[in-house]
């Protein structure tokens, strides 16, 4: 029986306000995890910055850190928390998504996946045990199970076979995680495991898989294989189908999603955890989120705009600089431009989650969601 870590504090409709207790601090949910693929946010954002902008959880990538600097080096440096000077929770994804999306020459077998590194082409094998070993070396707070991220579209026959294999892989992940957590030299002996629900856009397969993995009594459950080309309506339909069949006393994580409007829709359906590279990636290109939706600071109309990115925003960029100045930095190819916009976008997302939590606490989430969607008008 897993230790009770999640407490449901309040429900407003299906929207959930909770707390998730971890060895590295208590996470207030719903939460957006800030993505630092290689143990850093792209855009010259430090772990100190993350604290300043309200980040609760940092997400790093198993596949990328395995390739460089190498998970064994991270372990020798005392684990990811010590390595990147971050004392709050870290979630590591299993590497599965990158293996299936980035790596070349994949061969999927029952034991795992054979593939070529996207960096130097060398042959690598990763299976459930290897993914758990790498994540154990990294010492993250939460490890994700190794699964196959099914391409969209896929035939029903292929999805059924893939989901059955993902279930067998999850059983192996759990067994290996239990073994690793018992070893004397393990970085984090309380490392937690989240399982991942798959099934493409086939609701009945999704539901059966949710029922199966629910019985494994894991620390949390993710809905994977979305935001890979399906429509928003298909994504929401899958969430509606799956959430009722996952345990109410465990957090639910929607992987890789997404836009602020997607987050509001998913929170309304009972989702607790989110992550996406979108706010940082957009920021690096001058696309920033505001209370009126997303704007592109590269546009000529901002050349003489003396306002902050988003009036009323308390992020470091908005408190100190104008749209005109930041646009100038982009045109001059100054790195500070990217840094300021990434800081702003991540602050925007973290503050959105704080406001969502307040709305659920106050029992006005439906009104809050409607107001935000109206303000953004399809631009966020």
From Swiss-Prot:
Molecular function via GO: metal ion binding; tRNA-guanosine(34) queuine transglycosylase activity
Active site: 93, 275
InterPro entries reported for this sequence: ArchSynthase1/Queuine_TRR, TGT, TGT-like_sf, tRNA_ribo_trans-like
Binding of substrate, residues: 93-97, 147, 198, 225
Cofactor note: Binds 1 zinc ion per subunit.
Keywords attached to this entry: Glycosyltransferase, Metal-binding, Queuosine biosynthesis, Transferase, tRNA processing, Zinc
EC number: 2.4.2.29
Region (RNA binding): 256-262, 280-284
Pathway terms, separated by semicolons: tRNA modification; tRNA-queuosine biosynthesis
Broad enzyme group: transferase
Gene Ontology cellular component list: cytosol
Gene Ontology biological-process annotations: queuosine biosynthetic process; tRNA wobble guanine modification; tRNA-guanine transglycosylation
HAMAP family associated with the record: Q_tRNA_Tgt
Name of this chain's protein: Queuine tRNA-ribosyltransferase
Gene this protein is translated from: tgt
